[in-house]
Every structure is written in C-alpha cells, then in structure tokens.
Amino acid sequence: MSLGYNFCPLVREICDKYGVLLIADEVVTGFGRSGAMFGSRGWGVKPDIMVFAKALTAGYVPLSATVLNQRIEAAYLDNCDARGLLMTGFTYGGHPLACAAGMAVLDIVEQENLPANAALQGEYLLGQLLPFESRFRSVGNVRGKGLMLALV
C-alpha cells in the first residue's frame, strides 16, 4: 500500500529506459479511493495503459475499460483497416445501460470531488489508526493513501 513516493516513478523510469510498457491496473485504485482520481497519478506516474472497472459504475452494472496513451493509439490508427478501432470486444459484452451508469458515476465523482474527499477523510482516518501500532501487539504498522488504508 505505502510504497514510498520514489517507487512508482522509478518503475516508470525503468520501463522507459528498456522500452517496456507500464500498465496500471486501476480496478481497485481508480476513481478516487486513493485520494487521487487514479492511484498511479497519485504517485506521480502516467502509465502507458490503464485498465479499470467496478468503480466506473459504482458496482451497479458490469463495465470495464482500457485506456491507451497517444503512442499506442497512433500505432492502432496507422496499422488498422477499421480506422483505429480496437476490434477486441463483442456487441453482447457492452450495453447502453452500463455506459449511462458509467457517465453518471463520472459526473458524481467530478461534481462532488470525491478524490479530494477521500484524501481528506483518509488523512483523518489514518491519524485515528496510527496509535494502534503502539496500542496493539498484533498491528505491526498502519499505512496507505486516501481511503485505501491497511493495518498490517
């Protein structure tokens, strides 16, 4: 959970150095839970590919997405007869209800500034939990970002 601020930027640097794509799985960390819109961005990292789901519709309807950087998008545009479309899904795999739910959730996340609220509430909760490290022998440490906290 708490990786230290330099860890993720160092991973980004290594990926860039060796030409490796950095893929961020934001299924759990996306849409504000970590105190930033996406966990990777909260660590100061811009991945090449992001995948997310669940929180995109607040769990009401199944929906997931894969987001690509401009370089990868350009590769599809340059090498595809379908004008850059990613022909990897099927019509029965997505539907207007899920997309409408996703748009509604994104509106609420933005309007209510949920990432900033998660950061604020998480800071408070972390402060309340930190004394557990010295109070309970079974708690080694308390760590995390935003509302993604752990007692380890």
Identify the residue ranges that each predicted region occupies.
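Conserved N-terminal phosphate-binding loop of PLP-dependent enzymes in the Aspartate aminotransferase
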Residues: 1-152
